[in-house]
């Protein structure tokens, strides 16, 4: 019984940590590649934060310093679902709205674009929510899927160097989707807890 007194708090701590991770499920992507490096530079051009809470995914695009999201296809994602609803749009520039599916020049077609009317008042932050209408996303890393050209996210960007030049950027390129290290961290904590439990049981 004395040994159980020590083991119980460890197991509770592991369970609580897992619960907290489930509550704060997110993944980040980087817009690393442009369709016109000679005009836009080499990047990175911005980040995309995907947060999944209670089945609702909040997608936040943040432009890197020196860039803004502009015009049609200001931002785009490839949603991992056959049906979904989009809403709760925010922009710190011109207002944005859903513009359905379409091409982001050089990076193929994305099934969900969010657009502005023009490039007169670009935004450094654009956010919106997605709700799956055809199933359940198991994690934030499961919300998006690679398009046929092997890109997850893209954006129409304008470089802030006085030229007004625009182009497109996307990322990540093909391969697997990162899970933010959550799986590895939880595995490490669990193994550590088991090791401590074994020590107490043997003593």
Language-model features, listed with the residues they occupy:
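Bacterial N-terminal signal peptides that target proteins for export
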Residues: 1-8
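Bacterial N-terminal signal peptides
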Residues: 9-16
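Short, charged juxtamembrane terminal tails flanking transmembrane helices
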Residues: 200-203
């Amino acid at each position: 019984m004395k040994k159980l007194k020590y083991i119980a708090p460890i197991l509770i701590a592991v369970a609580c940590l897992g619960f907290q991770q489930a509550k704060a499920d997110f993944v980040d992507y980087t817009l690393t590649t442009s369709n016109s490096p000679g005009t836009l530079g080499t990047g990175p051009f911005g980040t995309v934060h995907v947060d999944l809470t209670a089945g609702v995914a909040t997608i936040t695009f943040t432009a890197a310093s020196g860039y803004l999201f502009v015009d049609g296809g200001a931002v785009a994602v490839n949603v991992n679902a056959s049906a979904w609803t989009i809403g709760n749009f925010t922009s710190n520039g011109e207002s944005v709205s859903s513009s359905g599916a379409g091409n982001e020049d050089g990076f193929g077609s994305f099934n969900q674009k969010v657009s502005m009317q023009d490039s007169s008042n670009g935004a450094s932050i654009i956010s919106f929510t997605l709700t799956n209408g055809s199933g359940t996303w198991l994690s934030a890393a499961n919300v998006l899927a690679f398009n046929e050209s092997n890109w997850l996210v893209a954006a129409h960007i304008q470089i802030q160097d006085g030229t007004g030049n625009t182009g497109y950027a996307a990322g990540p390129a093909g391969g697997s989707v990162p899970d933010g290290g959550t799986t590895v961290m939880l595995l490490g904590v669990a193994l550590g807890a088991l090791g401590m439990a074994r020590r107490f049981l043997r003593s």
